[in-house]
Amino acid sequence: MPTLNWIGKDKVANHHHDVPFRVLDHKYGYSAEKGEQSEVTKSGNKIIHGDNLEALKALLPEYEGKIDCIYIDPPYNTGKEKWVYNDNVNDKKIEKWLGEVVGAEGEDFTRHDKWLCMMFPRLNLLYKLLKEDGLFFCSIDDYEQGNLKPMLDIIFGHQNFLNNIIWQRAYSPINTKKRFSANHDFVMCYAKNKSQVNLLLPRTEDANDRYSNPDNDYRGIWKSSDFSVGPVVAEKLYPITLPSGRIVTPPSGRCWLLTKERYQEFIDDNRIWYGENGDAVPSVKKFITEVKDGMTPMTVWTYSEVGHTQDAKREIKELFPKSKLPFETPKPTKLLEKILSLKNNPNAIVLDSYAGTGSTAHAVLNLNKRDGGNRKFILVELEDYAEDITANRVKKAIRGYEFDGNKKTVLKSYSINLTNLKKSQKIIEELDLYKLNEKYSNVTLESDNGNIAIIGEEYISGKTEGTGGSFDFYELGAPIFNPDQNLNEEVGEQKIREYIYYTETKQHLEREQIAEQKYLLDNYNNTGYYFYYEKEKFTTLSVDTLNIVTEKAEQYLIYADHCLLEKEYMMARNIIFKKIPRDIKRF
């Protein structure tokens, strides 16, 4: 297979291993009920301010292999974003890039190399965080799409590529463009393990409306499907006598779906439909109870379905009417909702390491409100607006926000197809029913790109309805280890205890430290975990100091600076010694 090479590839291939592990410093919690609070909400929702490379590393102890869905919207590298390469890679060529704004095409001849060097270690960490049946989505355009695909093939494996979604982000051309006016972006989709993924979107009312029950079948509503197929199979070529007496044969170049014997079985089971007058070419009844729980997604998503860039800007303007926001291409919440719906799990953990305006969190909250789910979000944002914009938007989504003006809502949407054209009268009747709803000052029909929608417009003056929910805000703290690989005591002993306990058990340390059991972390799975550590002196595990063990267990794992116990002695008593700091696991 072709390989992707770039300046610095060999230097960044394992750079994610060199990134220091930092603790997360909790700054505050926020909930719909209490507002801002000093206590941790324990909601599982997190917003982290800091470099996403270090933040992703900090998430590994708790979330490695546990994230259900990842969505990222990295810099497109158009030359306009003014992003800066800041990864401290030990290489002379790369060190020259540090702190430099990446320039435009034709001005900066290493711009694509810088982008690939920036993305590669982050994608490696994202891959480690993703669950075995997890989904990965990345927004991109043509500037780097051609480089992103082979890079993701390296990390995920080309066999785990699912598809490239085309999102229609603009609804009108930019006439000042010299050649083409691009009106789409891509959303690249990969699985951690394709064999464990089943992509389905929730069934829509429009899809379900295609089912009916004209013959009152006890099995419920159904729709008819074609009884002829191709290519021709000889045993499936035979004449059929309809209930009306008319004789029909398959269309030219096709045959019937079933053999004559199986056709009779379907008749006996009342699964063949000849139309209301018994004179239609036979079709097979497909019951809604027998179809998949969701719908197979298509790869072209129009702005009428999921919104466009101007919709996204309007959303942000509603939330921050007096602010000039540093975003040219935010993503509409509807787009994120559809992406997240592909991971058909109401309890999914969702990660966005390029959080921007916080659209991903807003989409998670909307979905939870809509279906009663308990999805969690983790957002990471490097820039200083992580608090003022990203977190502030999530606060407003949770509690509602002041708004004065008209708000449009898609009440119902239909595909323009033969089935819906036949029931156009029913659509008009539904439109009239919505017009009776006093909530909406105006209800109209709007058509666009093969869809027709009933739009309700309401005037809101005051506070919008919030989604409810809560989150915790964190800053990236100090690294657990100093450059010399000794423990960094600045982070505090409790953070070190939590880190060690998690590396050993994959569990959170809930047990509080008390004076009588100073060195005990906790007991888990019949093993007692001890961190025999003193800030001012070395600790030695010996017969004289075994009194640090304060609770009986089947096995004991003890961290200390030194050990004087013989191996045979420890084996006889099921004691495992680990040296500080050498044996503390690094992520």
Locate predicted features.
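Conserved S-adenosyl-L-methionine
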Residues: 4-6, 13-15, 92-93, 116, ...
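Glycine-rich adenosyl-nucleotide cofactor-binding module
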Residues: 37-61, 310-349, 366
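DnaQ-like (DEDDh/DEDDy) 3′-5′ exonuclease domain used for proofreading
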Residues: 1-71, 76-121, 437-440, 451-457, ...
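Coupling/switch/interface segments within P-loop NTPase motor domains and analogous charged loops
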Residues: 1-12, 270-274, 546-547, 556-562, ...
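SAM-dependent methyltransferase catalytic-core segment centered on the flexible catalytic loop
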Residues: 64-135, 143, 159, 184-186, ...
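Active-site-adjacent helix-turn-beta-strand microarchitecture at beta-sheet edges
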Residues: 191-322, 332-333
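Signature of N6-adenine DNA methyltransferases within the class I
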Residues: 119, 132-133, 142-200, 387
